[in-house]
Amino acid sequence: MGQIHYNAWRLEFKQPFGALQAGNNVQSSVRVDCQNVTQVAVGVTKLDENTVFYPLTQDEDESDKYTGEIKITTSGLYHYYFRVRRENDAALYLGHLHGGLGKETTDISKVEPFQLTCYDRQVPRPEWYRNAVFYQIFPDRFANGNPHGEIDGKKPNTFLYATTDDRPMYIYDENHKIARWDFYGGNLRGIIAKLPYLKRLGVTALYLNPIFEASSNHRYDTNDYLKIDPMLGTEEDFKMLVTMLHENDMHLILDGVFNHVGKNSRYFNAGHLYGEQTGAANDKNSSYYEWFNFKHYPDQYDCWWGVDDLPTVNKDNPSYQQFIYGERGSVLTKWNDLGVDGWRLDVADELPDDFLREIRHNLDRYDDRILIGEVWEDASSKVSYGHRRPYVSGDNLYGTMNYPLRQWVISLLNGHCDLIKAGEDLLTLVENYPRNFLLDCLNNLGTHDTERILTVLNQSVPLVKIAFALLFNLPGIPCVYYGDEAGVEGGKDPDNRRYFPWGHENAELQKTVHYWADIRQECESLKEGQTGIMIAGNEVLGLIRYTADSATLLLVNRENQYAQVRDLQFMHVPASLQQAIEKRVAGLRMAPFTTRFTELNVISIMADEDN
């Protein structure tokens, strides 16, 4: 046993739990089990600034307890550790070990500090988003709404699949570049035609991969931000989609690809698609020339990750800024005025902080708009290009695509971590994120950039059913990738972008998604609740969500054998709720690869109790 005792997840030692709003203080306590103590202090460091020590005062009634306050005035990423000075002896230090616990050392260089996230503000999210169940659609691969399946706006030098059962593939040239793009012919009218299906499934909002004019099937190579891609339909089709969604109390967010454009776009126009003498690659006097950084004109230029099909745009250029988010005539203003309910920003870590804030300011001129960013890591400590990103500060993104949570689900269900570590990993993310930011993250089990969840879980339908249960019970907004509920398999791109198997769906998985979508709408704790963990003998994991007067418990047996609910351990769960759970579930026997969901009738949960 060490001589310094601390647990950041217990209110006995740290109040409040988790992230802190700037301008507030953290009450911090440690217990010190050693003699000749001359000083106890907590050292706090903001990124790239000097450490400030705050003395802790010995408690009059409990001599081993030392308490003080950390004063936080500005938002940012902070780290802290404890120092105990002793008479005629080396100082002791306590840094982070795992979970909320610390590790003691006499060597300051070996201290791994605890993280403290501080944010400026939390803005209440729109009510529709709070209640949302999202569905992500890759438009070319979902549905064709034309009467006889005819394909609109066929592009030159492309190929069309003979049937929607064909597996997607890329055709490369001798330089391993895409020689011609492949299409199935899905369109906006197809999405409109399938709205009844989506509504029956329990979907209340759509996230569409890019729909603007482009050369590729994924359309992340935008050619014209102000036009719908002709293969997907017309602007009138888009307006009809928005109208039909809103009439059905459903909402829509679009994919904003503002870091780069297509090489053949009207802005760059390397292939003369928009005329021989227009665009930055053909005319140095073009109004778009200053948008790009040419190293050797016109063939060498900055592009996204070295992909010359995707010239990078200079986000600091005033003309480009006004084009994207200006108040009048901008890309955002046009589509927001047509009824878009929010945006998902592609490669958000490539967009400067000020650029993100101005996008947010544009959206804030409208009621109930949402802004989500593509960030693959823990957004509270994300660093890109040597700069820590203030995603969680409250003035740019509402939330991010929660890839860390996806990885958590996969590691749990593939048995890559024991249940104690799984619980600690989840609560670490909960601790690091401001509460609203955590609840606003768009959770997924797969996207167009990942392998399909059925493939990742080795074609195990029972495990995918558990994954869906977790998706709808974890903090955040659930988002189903098109076809996952139908049992679509798929490895890496392009295999993860197969056409939806209409008429050949997995009814068991569809029923599972429908069930959990209904449960989420009924349970307030799943939308607003705190998050706790229960471990039963390292056999069963319990995911607990609770508010002041309601709670739910999801029990998960990930093993291919029966499991007993016994030897309960809790993490970040109020004592009164622990007692209610023990009475309800102790002794239960769970079948292999199953879940059990319970609503707990607790009159009042004291969320500020210790655990």
What are the functions of these language-model segments?
Residues 1-130, 204:
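Glycan-association/targeting regions that enable binding to alpha-glucans and other polysaccharides
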Residues 27, 534-571:
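Carbohydrate-binding surface patches
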Residues 30, 137, 198, 208, ...:
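Conserved, mostly hydrophobic/aromatic
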Residues 32-34, 79, 133, 584-611:
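C-terminal beta-strand-rich structural cap/linker in extracellular carbohydrate-active enzymes
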Residues 133-135, 206-208, 252-254, 343, ...:
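Hydrophobic faces of well-ordered beta-strands that scaffold small-molecule active sites
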Residues 138-204, 211-338, 359-365, 381-382, ...:
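Substrate-binding/active-site clefts of carbohydrate-active enzymes
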Residues 242-251, 260, 265-276, 331-333, ...:
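Active-site-proximal helices and loops of the catalytic beta/alpha 8
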Residues 427-526, 563:
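Active-site-proximal substrate-binding groove within the catalytic cores of carbohydrate-active enzymes
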